[in-house]
Amino acid sequence: MKKLFCIIALAGIALTAWSQKPLRLSTYNGTSVERYDGQQCDVTADRYLFTGWNTISLPFAMTEQELDEALGQGVKLERLVGVTQQGNEIVLNFQDCKAEGIKANQPYILYYPGETSSKKFSANAQVVNKESKMTLTTSGGVEVTMSGAAFKTDGKGLYGILAINNVDANFTYIDNEKGFFYATRCYISIPGEQQFTLTPRHWAAGEVTSINDIAAANDIIDVYNVLGVRVAHNIKAGDVNNLDPNIYIVKGRKILVK
C-alpha cells in the first residue's frame, strides 16, 4: 500500500512538473500554443523593442510588477478604448492600463524608454490559446480592428507602428508586398479600399471617469467627442452608456463608455 502511495505521489509530482515545463515562444514566425492551452507554464518570449512605442500581444498574462522587472518602471502600457472619426481621420483613443498588467491575448501599445534591444518577457502563467482581436466602430460606421499576430503575418493593407515613426505611436498604412508583422506584434485593419489617417491620443488612467461620477441618471446633457463635435443633444445622462464604446466629453469632463 505504501509503495502504491509513493508511485501515485511521484506521478503527481511528475504531472505538476510537466504542466509547468518551460515554453519558449518564437517572436519571429510564432509558436502554436494549442496543446498548452489552459496549462500553467514557465513562459518566455524574447522580444526586440525599439526605443519609443511598440505593440505587444502575448498568449499569457503578466503582472505590473513582472512588466517593471522585465523592462523598467518607465514602461507604459495602453489599450485601445475608442475610435473617433472626422472625415478621413480616425483618432485612436488609448488609455493607460499598466496597473492591470498584460492580459492574455489582448492587443496593446507599449512605450519602452530604454535603448533598442531584445528584452525578455517571462512569467509562470496559464497559456491561453485564442484569437487576439478587438473591434470598435466609429460614429461613421467604420470598423477598426486591432489584432495581435500569433504568427508572422502579411502586412499589406494593414496599419502598423513603424520603427522610424514610433515617437507618437503612429499607425501607418502598409502598401507594399514586403511589409509584414512578426509574431507578438499588433496591427490595425479597416475593411474597404479607403485609406485613413490614424491619429493616436493617449489618456492617463485617472484622466477619464464614468458618467455616474459627474451626473445623475436623469440629468439632461450634451455629449461631445474628443474632437469637440457634438454627438448627442439633450439626452439623459443614464443613456450615455448606450453610445458606442469610446471616450466622450460631458460637462467638460472626459468619460469612458465601455
Stretches with model-predicted labels:
Residues 8-18:
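Hydrophobic h-region of N-terminal signal peptides that target proteins for export
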